[in-house]
Design a protein with these regions (language model features):
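Short, amphipathic alpha-helical interaction segments positioned at domain boundaries
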Residues: 85-107
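A short, conserved structural fragment
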Residues: 66-76
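Short alpha-helical segments that sit at the start of domains
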Residues: 1-34
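Minor-groove-contacting beta-hairpin "wing" of winged helix-turn-helix DNA-binding domains
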Residues: 76-83
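Short amphipathic alpha-helical interaction segments
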Residues: 51-67
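Short acidic, hydrophobic short linear motifs in intrinsically disordered regions
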Residues: 32-46
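Short acidic, glycine/proline-enriched loop segments that cap or flank alpha-helices
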Residues: 49-53, 87-89
Length: 107
């Protein structure tokens, strides 16, 4: 997916892909601010099959979203940042750029 990019561009692209193709659609689908690892894995597998992407690429993106503060992990659940809840309630598009902007505005 990202072989010809530098390390930082590759990490950003992994985060962007995981957020826009897996996490945000999952959040809208389940209509909840949190999801389990099992729910994530099911959605990831569906997306990876359709897009032809390795699951290992998406795991790096998930960890990176945790490090950026867009996602939080508590016990067995992953949750979105509180500033993104309004987007979920409105069923609005929340791309990676919007998500990172909202998270940075809070801190």
């Amino acid at each position: 997916m990202l072989s010809d990019k530098g390390k930082y561009a590759s990490a950003t692209e992994n985060r962007r892909f995981v957020w826009q193709e897996i996490i945000w659609p999952l959040i809208l689908e389940i209509n909840d601010v949190s999801f389990s690892l099992k729910q994530y894995q099911k959605k990831r597998d569906q997306v990876c099959e359709v897009k032809g992407v390795e699951a290992s690429t998406t795991s790096r993106g998930l960890v990176s979203l945790l490090q950026k503060g867009i996602l939080f992990k508590e016990n067995a659940l992953y949750s979105i940042h509180y500033r993104l809840i309004a987007y979920m309630r409105l069923k609005a598009d929340c791309n990676y750029a919007t998500a990172i902007h909202e998270v940075r505005m809070s801190g």
